[in-house]
Amino acid sequence: MGKSRQNSTTTVDREKDEIQKAMGHEKAEFEALEVARHGGREIDDLIDDMERQLDEAGGLNKGFFQVQFANPKHFTWLLVAFASMGGLLSGLDQSLISGANLFLPDDLGLTEHENSLVNSGMPLGAVGGALLLSPANEYFGRKGAIIISIILYTIGAALEAGSINFGMIVSSRVILGLGVGLEGGTVPVYVAETVERRIRGNLVSLYQFNIALGEVLGYAVGAIFLNVPGNWRYILGSSLLFSTIMFFGMLFLPESPRFLIHQKRHLDAYKVWKRIRGIEDRESREEFYVMSASVVSEENAVAEGAKNHRFPWMDFFTEPRARRALVYANIMILLGQLTGVNAIMYYMSVLMNQIGFDKKESNYMSLVGGGSLLLGTIPAIFLMERFGRRFWAITMLPGFFIGLVLIGVSYQFDVETQLQTVEGLYLSGLIIYMGFFGSYACLTWVVPSEVYPTYLRSYGMTTSDALLFLASFIVTYNFTAMQNAMGKTGLALGFYGGIAFIGEIYQIFFMPETKNKTLEEIDVVFSRPTMDIVRENWAGVKETTHLLLTGHWHKVFVEQAMTDPKDQVQVSHA
């Protein structure tokens, strides 16, 4: 009995030590959270000191590009609108190739293998763009990295439109992909680091909405230029308009305040915070205090050698808190990509042609898939923080499976003799699959942008972004070969559907909840041992199952949605 108690005590001590080790000098962060909860005087002292420094420096920066609103919340919406336009560019450039696919191969004399490389060139380039994410974010900041990505978008689109051979079109697609990869990993972090926690998940989800909107616009552009000579050139070059608008819009936006503190530019961070969040609201003052304490404690830990100062990447292997975030975020991304969504998006017009539509009809019918994805993102934008991350992950994956089953079954009927059955089943499955994926896709940007510690966030997003586009490249490049090897039903139902089924089991057990938490509180969540999270999730599953079986639907859905957004993770100092 004594030995058992001793082992139990040792386990508790080991877990405490693990938390302290994983978070380095996070005692300062814990204390900052407690000060914020109890309204300590330290918060006002910090704000007063920053105001004094601001007065000595001559006040807030003035100038043509220094936009300021009477109500800081209006600045938040401006910031999110322009930053998230990167999602629109990304989605637009992903779907434009679908319409161009009907004409480009014949005009340039491409083989089937060469056309696969053209389609997969952008996700391949995006892997390279993701690898640029860390150095670009560390040396140029979040804002600078976004501007660089826009320049790459512009160069790539211009070269695409003017391509005269296979080498030129592939090169332009890779350059375009560099912009997609760099921007895709930067914008969600930029938004997550600048907006208030209660709407963070909703506004990061807006990025996915813009991706879906861009994909719909891409299909619409394909339809507009369908009967124009040289149509695919106009289709691929149309994104130049949006990249130009976004470039000028980004010039008016500030740098991320968390990044500025990370760079030891505390006064600049305070200036930005005052412009975009204000200091009149108590919650905003508390969040600035906690953010400052958290980032400073991380930087001190690095400086004192508690972490791998020269090789920050190593913390993903040596620090349990960072490792948990890396494993979870990247498995979640893989589960989405390996269900084939990007292959379906890129080959949408070709797939429509395979089930009986002519080229013109195929282009128009592509709007069905893109429109379903767009509509599917809307609930997540408004309800991400209300229902939480686990709800969206666990309820969306079964929708993938059902949609893929219908798509797979549709291939079992003869297009020549049962055309209506084939098209009915296929389109129904496509609508269900894309609709459910719209909400899940929001998580692939929300979760990676919030789970990594500040000093590793750009490195973490590099791995997540690179993995996302690497999986997209693999799925897209091998789509035709896999379809020929497995059969259309085997690929849709067996492979893609099987991934969705496995993913559901993983999310049920291993996905922690991070809704309504500051980025600093999420540090605490991922400092807990994985088995603690699994036990907590399993207890929640049993309770939810019991409530559903006994007819208490109100407690499962309504009460969860009414959770007080001010609820925060409690930190024990025992």
Swiss-Prot record:
InterPro entries: MFS_dom, MFS_sugar_transport-like, MFS_trans_sf, Myo-inositol_Transporter, Sugar/inositol_transpt, Sugar_transporter_CS. GO terms for biological process: myo-inositol import across plasma membrane. Coiled coil: none annotated. Its main location: membrane. Changing residue 277 to G/K: Abolishes production of the polyketide mycotoxin fumonisin B1 (FB1), severely decreases macroconidia production. Signal peptide: none annotated. Gene3D superfamilies: MFS general substrate transporter like domains. It catalyses: myo-inositol(out) + H(+)(out) = myo-inositol(in) + H(+)(in). The keyword Transferase does not apply. GO terms for molecular function: myo-inositol transmembrane transporter activity. Keywords: Cell membrane, Membrane, Transmembrane, Transmembrane helix, Transport. It is a multi-pass membrane protein. Residues 98-115, 165-173, 227-233, 352-363, 412-426, 487-490 are extracellular. The chain crosses the membrane at residues 77-97, 116-136, 144-164, 174-194, 206-226, 234-254, 331-351, 364-384, 391-411, 427-447, 466-486, 491-511. It holds the Pfam family Sugar_tr. Residues 1-76, 137-143, 195-205, 255-330, 385-390, 448-465, 512-574 are cytoplasmic. NCBIfam families: SP. Belongs to the major facilitator superfamily. Sugar transporter (TC 2.A.1.1) family. PANTHER family: MAJOR FACILITATOR SUPERFAMILY (MFS) PROFILE DOMAIN-CONTAINING PROTEIN, PROTON MYO-INOSITOL COTRANSPORTER. This is Myo-inositol transporter FST1. It comes from Gibberella moniliformis (strain M3125 / FGSC 7600) (Maize ear and stalk rot fungus).
